[in-house]
Amino acid sequence: MEKFSDAVSEALEKAFELAKSSKHTYVTENHLLLALLENTESLFYLVIKDIHGNPGLLNTAVKDALSREPTVVEGEVDPKPSPGLQTLLRDAKQEAKTLGDEYISGDHLLLAFWSSNKEPFNSWKQTTKVSFKDLKNLITKIRRGNRMDSPSAESNFQGLEKYCKNLTALAREGKLDPVIGRDEEIRRTIQVLSRRTKNNPMLIGEPGVGKTAIAEGLALRLIQGDVPESLKGKQLYVLDMGALIAGAKYRGEFEERLKSVLKDVESGDGEHIIFIDEVHTLVGAGATDGAMDAANLLKPALARGTLHCIGATTLNEYQKYIEKDAALERRFQPIFVTEPSLEDAVFILRGLREKYEIFHGVRITEGALNAAVLLSYRYIPDRFLPDKAIDLIDEAASLIRMQIGSLPLPIDEKERELAALIVKQEAIKREQSPSYQEEADAMQKSIDALREELASLRLGWDEEKKLISGLKEKKNSLESMKFSEEEAERVADYNRVAELRYSLIPQLEEEIKQDEASLNQRDNRLLQEEVDERLIAQVVANWTGIPVQKMLEGEAEKLLILEESLEERVVGQPFAVSAVSDSIRAARVGLNDPQRPLGVFLFLGPTGVGKTELAKALADLLFNKEEAMVRFDMSEYMEKHSISKLIGSSPGYVGYEEGGSLSEALRRRPYSVVLFDEIEKADKEVLNILLQVFDDGILTDGKKRKVNCKNALFIMTSNIGSPELADYCSKKGSELTKEAILSVVSPVLKRYLSPEFMNRIDEILPFVPLTKEDIVKIVGIQMRRIAQRLKARRINLSWDDSVILFLSEQGYDSAFGARPLKRLIQQKVVILLSKALLKGDIKPDTSIELTMAKEVLVFKKVETPS
């Protein structure tokens, strides 16, 4: 029985299937040839590519030849190998024997085809102008002395080409982005690579700081010759772990593939450098039932210095995987890649701007680059520069690109208006009213005018699109010219360099300037093709849910009147409103301590005076919705073990993977108002967890991950000292000061809270009991809310002073604050109106007024002024 390699066995099976599906009686050499050509990873296909043949041309010719084969019209077909195929396989077996191989592989079949003179292969062979002897020499060169001694041996040839990407080739073709501002790290990498032994740099840094970019920067320097003499002419390859592992079905197959890559690198006499991204994935890869993992295969070559390797991994993975394997760790030289500063990140973005402008066909302003860095640094704390800033620029540019391809809003609105007018015109025609003709004529005039306006808008839109499209094409041409200039300079074609640098490139740059000027001078622009800071803010807002763009639109004015905005909802608490407003203003302009939370407040006071309401009002004002407030009822945290609810369970306990309610809430929404309700009810061990949060703005969860709390506002509420506070306020009346109130409450507070906990609170804010005047204001606020809800049903609600007086007198209770008032309004007003709505006494498009009749609350309909 013949021994075939896996690739040839697969090709023979495909050939039989192809003959059967095509209703052919014989499996011919052309069926096999087509099956071999379809496997682009096979040795057969790779050799054809190496001789600069055109596989596509041969594929077409073979399909054409097979279409002329005789077919069976009816019944099932069981195709048999043709005599030609049997001869071909015998010839391939002879070639294998000549080369000393046990298995017939793709290169043996290619040699057999070459000597067979079968059509259409023979005609295609003539186009390559390669002799049988040249082909055999090429195969010997590719094999590098290896033998076909296993079914999978064929997949191990040309390991570099199969399982690696040539970064220097990509750099030469201009497919890599420019690398800006990493000169020191690239120099350090070159220095380590130039060592005699252990010449293997390990790039260690957080995700997104630019480790892969350093490898790309080295590739760019290699093609420019900007490296020491010892590295000139070397090729940099990046190992594709996915390709290496994919399809390795049998034990040992993965190791064979990796060994083939290492053998190719070592046989290159130091001309090849391998870059392994996420190098920690090699530790343990392929190790099953005592088999060696990939890292152990690398160690001997790394130690000898015959393998030049650059690794890249994050600090966490380095500690978790590489440091544990001391033998592997000592073979690499660590190079720490830090996150760039804000200035360096802007510098990097400037270098990449042109690439993104050309790709998206937009313009990116300097302000957009600065905003991308600053806003990503401030509002996306769990990712790293420059990656997060680049992502912002990319997404903002793609948003503009999408808008350019969509119908502009003014045209869309006019088209909708036109459609509505045409529908109305048809309705008038059907009515045939006395004034029908007059109305129809007037309608037609409006339609004609609108159509004319639409035609003008569409013409302007088309012109703008043409200008923008033309600009994109010219910028693409400019990039191609600059790349051609660099290429010509590398090969010392100075005539071409001079032509491009001093003639063609300046001319095209001038044309681009003129087109941009004519685009900017257009009146009533329909398309925006500029990425600015407002758009970047919009993208940040979409990502994080934080209304960042409001700050750019002049939120400063709003912040100056923050007290007034809060007092519309929280009545009678001037101390708390003023202190919280000052803290938020300082945070918004960036003058607060960046290493601490935005604010840590303790609201002290009796029930129903507005402590929770102020927290809700802050969330609404800062983030446009009350849901941005994360609330924790501390009566649920009265046991020591309830700490795990906040930060997550420790390893080995149930719920470890779920995370904690506080840590996960702040990880998902770092900009939040966090409310700890009734803080005195929590266990002291639970409060100790908050010490680190309030002091450093950091929370360490059950998985030892650091959660950034620096952008959250922490509010605690408590009823501690409420009797003393109420008693003091009733005695002093209106002569109250914050310091005096705190002097009364502090002794009681110290019995519940530890000194170190109290020391980390920014401000303790007393909430005083509500007066009758405060209750009157609260009644007005509550009634306006009810009126707002009715307005959505097209019902206008009003009330007279007697209603306010009645509700404030009935709902006032100094011990319980405003909560009894809310219940009273629910019973007296909401229930009254809901019954009337259900009975049909109140209908949409009506106005009603609440008033008092013999100590009873009633409503009456009011005529709406015409």
From Swiss-Prot:
InterPro entries with a match to the protein in the record: AAA+_ATPase, ATPase_AAA_core, Clp_ATPase_C, Clp_N_dom_sf, Clp_R_dom, ClpA/B, ClpA/B_CS1, ClpA/B_CS2
Predominant subcellular localization, coarse grouping: cytoplasm
KW Nucleotide-binding (keyword) present: yes
Region annotation (Linker) ranges: 340-545
Location of the protein in the cell: Cytoplasm
Molecular-function annotations in GO: ATP binding; ATP hydrolysis activity
Domain of life (superkingdom): Bacteria
Record's keyword terms, sorted: ATP-binding, Chaperone, Coiled coil, Cytoplasm, Nucleotide-binding, Repeat, Stress response
Positions of ATP 2 binding: G605, P606, T607, G608, V609, G610, K611, T612
Summary of the function given for this chain in its UniProt record: Part of a stress-induced multi-chaperone system, it is involved in the recovery of the cell from heat-induced damage, in cooperation with DnaK, DnaJ and GrpE. Acts before DnaK, in the processing of protein aggregates. Protein binding stimulates the ATPase activity; ATP hydrolysis unfolds the denatured protein aggregates, which probably helps expose new hydrophobic binding sites on the surface of ClpB-bound aggregates, contributing to the solubilization and refolding of denatured protein aggregates by DnaK.
Protein's name according to its UniProt entry: Chaperone protein ClpB
